[in-house]
Amino acid sequence: MKLCGFDVGIDQPLFLIAGPCVIESEQLAIETAGQLKELTDALGIPFIYKSSYDKANRSSTKSFRGLGVEEGLRILQKVKDEIGVPVLTDVHEDTPLDEVASVVDVMQTPAFLVRQTNFIQNVCRQGLPVNIKKGQFQAPWDMDQVVAKAREVGNDQIMVCDRGTSFGYNTLISDMRGLASMRQTGCPVVFDATHSVQQPGGQGTTSGGQREMVPVLARAAIAAGISGVFMETHPDPENALSDGPNMWPISRLKPLLETMKELDEVVKRHGFIEDQS
């Protein structure tokens, strides 16, 4: 599959979707996009910048949601123009999809909306690549039907993304077998290494997270066989306005990316026995 000018797939080099959880300010967006571009260019990792203009799925009405669609899209356009990177953002049921599609390069659907047929198909009708997140409540093989809905409206630029599975209260678990199952959709599989360590609602009015486990799950997912990694990152996660406990610090990103790239190359050089009939 062609994505933002580069090839993605289980037989292609690992790509990265990364950026702060939410657009906090124009300055933060420009600075983080620039840092991430510099890092990924140096390592030769294809890169898409990610940040959200609105976080609809919040633990509390007091949680920061973002700058809104108009200001958020203006900033994402500026990131594209000044930094020269493709951009991704997530959309919701009340999103003006045509406005978003006029700016971004990739759309992303939230995990909690994965079974909303009209929503999934309306997003896919925009004609852009779509990263569809698997619901935390959903079996990996059930993504077959979600992909079928997307393809029914003529969109073959579909990625499927695993962000963990509910495991009791306030806890997620990552079953690496699910990544192999999701490969059977024929779509590039993306692993969300930061939301997978989230503890949803675990701090009462906000979600917690086990940031120290991000590298563990990222390495495991790459060893299992994926096309790309989704990772939210921030210069100061402790003071981030959204999802700080599970974001990875930009200052510690380079060694992690180096490990991820090397591991991906080794795994893909040997292929995947489980996919051979």
UniProtKB/Swiss-Prot annotation:
One of its GO terms (molecular function) is 3-deoxy-8-phosphooctulonate synthase activity. Disulfide bonds: none annotated. Its EC number is 2.5.1.55. InterPro entries: Aldolase_TIM, DAHP1/KDSA, KDO8P_synthase. It holds the Pfam family DAHP_synth_1. Keywords: Cytoplasm, Lipopolysaccharide biosynthesis, Transferase. Pathway: Carbohydrate biosynthesis; 3-deoxy-D-manno-octulosonate biosynthesis; 3-deoxy-D-manno-octulosonate from D-ribulose 5-phosphate: step 2/3; Bacterial outer membrane biogenesis; lipopolysaccharide biosynthesis. Transmembrane segments: none annotated. It catalyses: D-arabinose 5-phosphate + phosphoenolpyruvate + H2O = 3-deoxy-alpha-D-manno-2-octulosonate-8-phosphate + phosphate. One of its GO terms (cellular component) is cytoplasm. SUPFAM superfamilies: Aldolase. It is found in: Cytoplasm. Its main location: cytoplasm. GO terms for biological process: keto-3-deoxy-D-manno-octulosonic acid biosynthetic process. HAMAP family: KDO8P_synth. Belongs to the KdsA family. This is 2-dehydro-3-deoxyphosphooctonate aldolase. It comes from Hydrogenovibrio crunogenus (strain DSM 25203 / XCL-2).
